[in-house]
Amino acid sequence: MSLATLDTTEHPNLPTVSTTLFKAKAARKLSFEKIGEHIGRNEVAAAAIFYGQAKPSREDIEKLADLLHIPQQPLEEQLNGFPDRGRSVEMPPKEPLIYRLYEIVQNYGYAYKAVLNEKFGDGIMSAISFSTKVEKETDEDGNNWAVITLRGKWLPFSRF
């Protein structure tokens, strides 16, 4: 099994704790799926903590420290603040997989918007009251397919 690692030269805007977390993850040979299971969160949520894009609870930090064999106190100090979301990726992204996700929004963004507006009315899908998951499907020909589910609360625009 291949594991996601971190090249800090590719990610200069990540918090310093990201390096600590990724080094420990590699040393323990853990996937984000296993880390998520251990802390009781989705694998994408676990990865978002490592990239500084999600705020872990105190319990998450305790469980991460235990699993990754990292002293809890410095980990708490480094993860205690609020995430600076959205700064970790330059736009447009250069990394091919992230660029493909960006390209999906470029190509289908207005189509998604039109269909969502027709189904829900004038509003937006929350990225705060939100969950996501990644699944792998294999078709009858043996081809692998990535299935990404985005689930966000619908927030209607207020009339004023």
Swiss-Prot record:
Q: What is this protein called?
A: Cyanate hydratase
What's an example GO BP annotation here?
A: cyanate metabolic process
| Enzyme Commission no | 4.2.1.104
Name the keywords, alphabetized. Answer: Lyase
| Residue numbers annotated as active site | R100, E103, S126
InterPro entries xrefs: Cro/C1-type_HTH, Cyanase, Cyanate_lyase_C, Cyanate_lyase_C_sf, Lambda_DNA-bd_dom_sf
Q: Which CDD domains does the record associate with it?
A: Cyanase_C, HTH_XRE
Q: Which reaction does it catalyse?
A: cyanate + hydrogencarbonate + 3 H(+) = NH4(+) + 2 CO2
Gene encoding this chain? Answer: cyn1
Domain of life, per UniProt, equals: Eukaryota
- What is the top EC class of this enzyme, as a single word? lyase
As for what it does, the entry says:
Catalyzes the reaction of cyanate with bicarbonate to produce ammonia and carbon dioxide.
Gene3D superfamilies in alphabetical order: Cyanate lyase, C-terminal domain, lambda repressor-like DNA-binding domains
Q: Name the family the entry cites.
A: Belongs to the cyanase family.
Q: Name one GO molecular function term.
A: cyanate hydratase activity
